[in-house]
């Protein structure tokens, strides 16, 4: 085993060498870290964080097939609306819509009754895992004690989690949370409760809910939680390069894994690059993104009933985070155009010049 491991590291280092000689300065610094990593690193599993409106079943299927490198995908949270589960949420977690990938469905609920309603759907669909969202920072939901808005109320968190675990001893529950809604200490006040409960893992994004995605991540706040947490802990937040991942795993060596959302939407190859220890070339990236785009476009064309306008709107969101360093003029056209033909030619230009 150790001999194979050494051979694998040597192979990864050999793959890096040409980039040191011919790569630009960004590639060279990435590669130096990759070589260091290949010699020292314990590669952690990468999980794909859910983003409402972006990482639906269509996107997940295409990403898993074309890029891969992801151990687990999470569905955007399933929630109750007007007393019932939103139909599109139920469709999104259908096992038939998520073949050949490991999906953990996520839910958001302000109380045990609503949670129970959603859990019955998960169980009906055959899921044995569920992620409970205590991290969503959107004020409309948070004000009603959903997601991150529940963190200042330890009794409510306790009632929600204890009830779920008592009613479903066979389900492996995980929790995704932030440091707090208003104060970073909110998560620390909950830590004795978390440590007591039989959770599969915890995902922590080291920001406050009221920050949304603004400002810096608070690594000291993360560290305070990390030191006392007895469950497998996953880090989430502001990871855009393989270097970013490595600096976090070096600082927090006991992490069980890494969860990435926006960083993977911007660079869908990020998990792959981290795992193989080499960046993929611009040509390879353009080719793979082209395949991803074609697959997602064709799937939406078949699914959506609202004609060209609806399809265009959906595809514009596909580009919101993707390839931020791509041609600016082409990106502008993609977001401004109201014609499908102009959109398609702007996509070709963007990929052709990448």
Q: Which sequence ranges carry the predicted segments?
A:
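Active-site-adjacent beta->alpha loops and helix N-cap segments on the catalytic face
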Residues: 83-89, 139-162, 211-223, 269
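Short, small-residue-biased leader/transition segments that mark boundaries at the very start
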Residues: 1-6, 22
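Active-site beta-loop-alpha junctions enriched in small/polar residues
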Residues: 51-53, 78-80, 108-110, 135-137, ...
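Hydrophobic faces of well-ordered beta-strands that scaffold small-molecule active sites
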Residues: 46-49, 73-75, 103-107, 130, ...
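Alpha/beta catalytic cores of nucleotide-metabolism and tRNA/nucleoside-modifying enzymes
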Residues: 39-42, 46-47, 58, 159, ...
């Amino acid at each position: 085993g150790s001999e194979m491991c050494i051979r694998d590291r040597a192979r990864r280092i050999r793959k890096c060498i040409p980039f040191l000689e011919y790569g630009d300065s960004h590639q060279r610094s990435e590669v130096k870290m990759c070589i260091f990593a290949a010699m020292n690193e314990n590669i952690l599993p990468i999980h794909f964080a859910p983003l409402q409106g972006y990482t639906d079943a269509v996107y997940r299927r295409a990403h898993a097939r074309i890029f891969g490198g992801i151990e687990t995908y999470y569905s955007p949270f399933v929630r109750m609306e007007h007393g019932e589960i939103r139909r599109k949420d139920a469709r999104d977690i259908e096992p038939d819509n998520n073949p050949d990938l490991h999906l953990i469905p996520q839910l958001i609920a302000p109380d045990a009754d609503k949670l129970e309603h959603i859990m019955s759907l998960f169980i009906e669909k055959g899921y044995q895992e569920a992620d409970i969202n205590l991290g969503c920072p959107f004020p409309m939901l948070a004000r009603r004690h959903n997601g991150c808005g529940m963190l200042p109320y330890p009794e409510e968190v306790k009632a929600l989690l204890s009830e779920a675990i008592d009613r479903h001893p066979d389900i492996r529950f995980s929790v995704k949370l932030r440091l707090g809604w208003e104060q970073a200490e909110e998560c620390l006040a909950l830590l004795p409760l978390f440590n007591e409960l039989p959770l599969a893992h915890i995902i922590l994004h080291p920001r406050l809910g009221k920050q949304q995605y603004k400002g810096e991540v608070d690594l000291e706040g993360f560290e305070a939680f990390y030191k006392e947490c007895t469950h497998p802990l996953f880090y989430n937040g502001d990871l855009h390069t393989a270097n970013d991942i490595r600096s976090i795993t070096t600082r927090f060596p006991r992490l069980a894994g890494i969860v990435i959302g926006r960083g993977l939407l911007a660079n869908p190859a990020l998990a792959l690059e981290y795992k193989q220890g080499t960046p993929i070339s611009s040509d390879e990236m353009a080719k793979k993104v082209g395949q991803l785009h074609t697959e997602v476009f064709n799937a939406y064309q078949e699914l959506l009933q609202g004609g060209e306008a609806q399809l265009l709107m959906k595809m514009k969101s596909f580009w919101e985070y993707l390839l931020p360093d791509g041609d600016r003029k082409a990106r502008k056209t993609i977001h401004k155009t109201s014609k499908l033909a102009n959109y398609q030619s702007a996509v070709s230009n963007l990929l052709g010049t990448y």
